[in-house]
Amino acid sequence: MIESVHIRNFKSIRDVTLPLRPLNVLIGTNGVGKTNFISFFELLKSIFQQRLGAYTMDHGGIDRLLYKGRKVSDHIFGFIDFANTNGFEFLVRPKQSGVGYISYTCDYFNKNQENNKAYDSWSKKLWDKNVDESSLITNNQWRASYLKNYLNSFTVYHFHDTSNTSPMRGYCQIGDNVFLRENGSNLAAFLYTLSQTDKRAFDLIEATVRSIAPYFKRFDLKPDRNLMGQISLEWLENDSDFYQNGYSFSDGTIRFIALATLLLQTNLPQIIIIDEPELGLHPAAINKFAAMVKRASLHSQLIISTQSSNLVNCFEPEDVIVVDRKEGQTVFDRLDSNSLSVWLDDYDYSLSEVWEKNLIGGQI
């Protein structure tokens, strides 16, 4: 689990240290910087996977990633405290070519296993210095193996593309089934594997989909006989034998199927990060999604960004982090029940009403 994250000079985030819990729901209106916080984990993953150069260029160059550009910021700094045992730190600087390079990466090891946040007293090891890409992923030292396990433990999921060209709707390779991909492109293959290896989870996913789409009877997943090694999201409708596939689902339903598959699998990812999962979901589906999130948070750490009033109402104040923009910077404030008691108890406001009335920030 991530204990805390320290970010400096990344997009709209000037300098923030944010402790995290098993469940973290970021709420805020458009433009405050929720997605920038989520994007930080994509940057971190790109460093680990030796894709920093590609990542910076895909996002318009390093100036687009630096807080107010290189005229104001000359580096991006990140530090992640994993489970109070390991810390990973990096510093990225700009090159004249417009990409970023790694000034250094290092890790800290809490060898005494004490609840000690004086990281300078932890054992420190330098991994990279003044390189274009990190070498950590190919390092076989015992200490690197622990760090790689942590850095490989999270994925940012975006199930936004539900268009007719969405990879969730069409064919995918049946062998692409080890884990659900971040855009759901192997949804059919992953579900098929669950149906063969984890029937209990597969049945639960079907039942959950049925609860928000009563016309849905069950999935009818099988390898295509004409397209060798391919599979698509075929399913059966109640009271009909008409052929249905992924193109027959509404945008909200296919997004919900991907979310249910992610959250109801038995072998959950250690850290699950989801950007705006509420898009296109009916209020009843949002409530179901929240229930799945709470269930998953008993076994995994979840970080979710949203601007849905219905979704935030499903959680306790301590689960919610209000994201706001002040003096040109993104700031974060975790709620607590005691400070909100006058609004929640005395005035009988819901959590979303407190937010919508701008009593806790997060509204521009």
Name each region found by the language model:
Residues H282-N287, P317:
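Short alpha-helix of the ABC ATPase nucleotide-binding domain corresponding to the H-loop/switch region
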Residues M1-R14:
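N-terminal pre-Walker A segment at the start of P-loop NTPase domains
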Residues R21-H59, N183, F256-I257, S305-S308:
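Phosphate-binding glycine-rich loops of NTP-binding sites
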Residues G28-G31, E276-L281, L311:
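ABC ATPase nucleotide-binding domain "signature" loop
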Residues S39-G100:
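Conserved P-loop NTP-binding catalytic core
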Residues M1, A290-I364:
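C-terminal lobe/lid and adjacent interdomain/linker elements of RecA-like ASCE P-loop ATPase modules
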Residues D203-L264, I271, P277-A284:
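Conserved ABC ATPase signature
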Residues N86-D220:
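Electropositive, glycine-dotted interaction segments
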